[in-house]
């Protein structure tokens, strides 16, 4: 944590006790407004924009649990039971409804697409029900009257009551994000789920039936029989599931049958055939049923080029996988699709960020995943055509510009399910080092404490500027694996952000381990995974401390805290019929009206052009090659990174 010099947590007037200085306040209650937190060992740091749970102007009665602390009977804990009766309100607290939560996360720093605030978080019935200040109306006054939406787009601070039925999770000094959403998962091996949860991913969307050739190449669970068996297989895991059906067909009947069986969308993949006719036919079914189409386009350009694919799409919404092209797609200019307003572009993590090893590992990955024969020259040429360092270098910059909206893994099929979040933040770090602060994170032109030119300064000594931070960049990158994939798949009303009314799929991070190893993964309000020590130890902390499944990952709990996402059409046909499942089904919202403009912090559509001979990439007048990057005419060296944060020092054991 970095200390900001020009404000304190207590009033300037001294009372019977000396006011707390910022370091002292942080030691007791965690960082507060205007304090900065470094993310892992990266060059990124975030600044707390507001403190709804205390801090400047609100200090006193911060909720802390423990011996001699606040959350005790007749202090921070009220006598109000969990269900005090319908219609009861606490009139002494300004009409605030007295409905204590099941769990409160105290004094945690929330990092989400809408902003960065410190807050208490209330969870009830598996959902987020309030962000703001936990208190006891019998002994404390409320701090908030509803306020305004944070940054005009986020939640409003709310006061809520801690009761005797409330559990406490300490958020002091920690960061809270929404659970990760991976839209590109090949369901090959059950162990993938543990890897995903241990990395902070709580929603998996994709397809597969195991290590079959069709599944190692394509994220498809084809046909009702396989869909039923896959739902049954995934029922025991505390993750939300969305299955992709096979869209590479001209059979409308087949696709509708798969929707009725429970798919969340379709995958059109070149290995099954990604012709313009197939794309158009699948999108017709998508328009009828409201589901999304995920596209792995035609690398060989057999049935047409990238413009032919765009013509077949006809300005309809589409989720384009690994838009850079190494994972598959029109060679060499697939990446130009980021310019289209109807395309929701995504990356897969093997190309994130471009390093000295990125190109070297891709050839073998392509050969294995797509069942290619090294003895066949045409197969070798196919693999080689997909590996272009110039477009990988451009992908770095397009992420930082907000032109690529989504990050995903491509799990076990040219991607690593446990590294989606980590590689997102590694990319953000590389861009921070190379490009500096985003314009949105730069200070105002005029120093604080002065008026316009020609007028008398307000103060001869300008107020010190707070240190710069990477808030907008952090908000941009966290959105790539939370809210934006949720929007693309029609599940944003349920998951994807830390907002009231949504499922409590949350990840708690120690700042030093941010993006690498979650401290705790909360799934549907219950702790499902956490860093815990030896089970035979006398306390939870002795080594080896490992990410381990918790009670939310055992017994029947996963079915109560997770969803299978399907269409409203499927729910009307009773998806539980003929299946023995504990996990509930949840209807998605229609995805057909979701376009690039709806992607949070990542809706840029710069003009992108690729030289067909040299593979040189031009981004809005900037030139990108595999050696040197030109952004707005300024040369930026070292496109290949030789050292990254969030890497070996975190994985010695």
What are these regions (language model features)?
Residues 265-478, 487-489, 531:
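Active-site core of metal-dependent hydrolases
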Residues 178-189, 293-300:
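Histidine-centered catalytic micro-motifs
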Residues 234, 238-242, 294, 434-439, ...:
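Flexible, glycine/charged-enriched surface loops at secondary-structure junctions
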Residues 111, 186-188, 246-250, 272-273, ...:
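Short beta->alpha connector loops
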Residues 98-104, 165, 174, 181:
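A short, charged/proline- and glycine-enriched loop
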Residues 1-151, 158, 197, 202-203, ...:
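Active-site microenvironment of metallo-dependent hydrolases
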Residues 2-94, 133, 145-177, 193-278, ...:
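Divalent-metal coordination cores built from histidine and acidic residues
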